[in-house]
Amino acid sequence: MKMCNSDACRPLQGETLDTVFQGRLKIIQPEKGYRFSIDAVLLVGLTRIRQRDRVVDLGTGCGIIPLLLAYQHAIEHITGVEIQESLVSIARRNVLIN
């Protein structure tokens, strides 16, 4: 896991820092509105992805699905696409802390 001491790696007001896999994966997400839950973890558990596959997550939100996929599979390239600027910022920060 990456260690990030930058302010960009800390949740801002209105955000929370949550963990998955016994703290091995850290996720910043909005305190209100859409928040990931067990459905993202279950979805990733059902995927059959090979190492050289290219993956795109449309509407990635905080980036939970690409982060889970990267954690569970040795994937060379994952792209998360999001149009909400606030969520893009969170997703980028989540990549930094993981």
Report each predicted region and the residues it spans.
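Conserved SAM/SAH cofactor-binding pocket of Class I
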Residues: 45-98
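Class I SAM-dependent transferase core
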Residues: 7-51
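Short, basic/low-complexity N-terminal boundary segments at the transition from targeting/disordered tails
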Residues: 1-6
